[in-house]
Design a protein with these regions (language model features):
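Membrane-interface segments at the starts/ends of alpha-helical transmembrane spans
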Residues: 48-69, 138-159
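Membrane-water interface of alpha-helical transmembrane segments
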Residues: 7-24, 66, 94-102
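Hydrophobic core of alpha-helical transmembrane segments in multi-pass integral membrane proteins
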Residues: 28-29, 71-80, 108, 165-171
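Membrane-helix interface motif
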Residues: 31-49, 116-133
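Canonical alpha-helical transmembrane segments
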Residues: 59-91
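Loop-to-transmembrane helix junctions at the membrane interface
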Residues: 82-112
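Cytosolic juxtamembrane helix at the C-terminal end of the final transmembrane segment
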Residues: 2-16, 81-93, 120-127, 159-188
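Hydrophobic alpha-helical membrane-insertion segments
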Residues: 19-36, 101-122
């Protein structure tokens, strides 16, 4: 059975390319907004909570999706589109380059999985501690003062971003271990 890979002249390729452009625009605009808001908070208070503004901002209207959800979604969908349209760039990776890439992807997947589990456990512990103390905490405001107390991370933001990193690196590792396409597949 011959597998048909996407080529530039096919409609499917163009669909993936345009969706990738939309996802890239979403990622860049959300990141720019987050950096701007973080710098504003830093200039006023002298500290900031990484990702807090993205967790507390709902878009396009109240009680809809938060910016972290949009960023997570755009990152995952954008990566999938990139993996579908960018297969030609990986065809010529052989031997030591591919082995090095696979080791880096495996390492990144393990680190991201550890961070997801760690952040999720800390999040659950803080929720449980709040309930034991007699009040349900605002989940969107829970932070961890790691690695620096003056620059804590919002736990929802950290969990979603490291989950996206894990999914992308695990998928890339999976793709890198599949049977290789041949150079003849580049030009149909």
């Amino acid at each position: 059975m011959k597998v048909n890979y996407l080529h530039e002249n096919e409609t499917g390729y163009k669909v993936f390319l345009y969706i990738f452009y939309v996802c890239s625009f979403l990622m860049l605009s959300i990141t720019a907004y987050g950096v701007y808001a973080m710098l504003q908070e830093w200039s006023v208070d002298g500290k900031y909570v990484m990702g807090e503004v993205l967790v507390k901002t709902e878009f396009p209207f109240p009680h809809f999706a938060k910016l972290t959800t949009w960023l997570f979604f755009a990152t995952i969908i954008g990566w999938y589109c990139c993996s579908r349209i960018g297969w030609k760039r990986t065809v010529k990776l052989y031997t030591w380059k591919m082995a090095l890439l696979q080791l880096m992807l495996l390492g990144l997947a393990v680190i991201c999985l550890y961070e997801v589990l760690y952040n999720f456990m800390v999040l659950n512990a803080q929720i449980t501690a709040g309930i034991i103390d007699g009040h349900v905490p605002d989940i969107d405001s829970l932070t961890i003062a790691y690695p620096d107390a003056s620059r804590p991370w919002n736990l929802i933001f950290a969990t979603k971003m490291f989950l996206a990193g894990f999914l992308i690196s695990a998928h890339a590792f999976y793709l890198s271990t599949r049977p290789r396409k041949s150079v003849e597949d580049i030009n149909p």
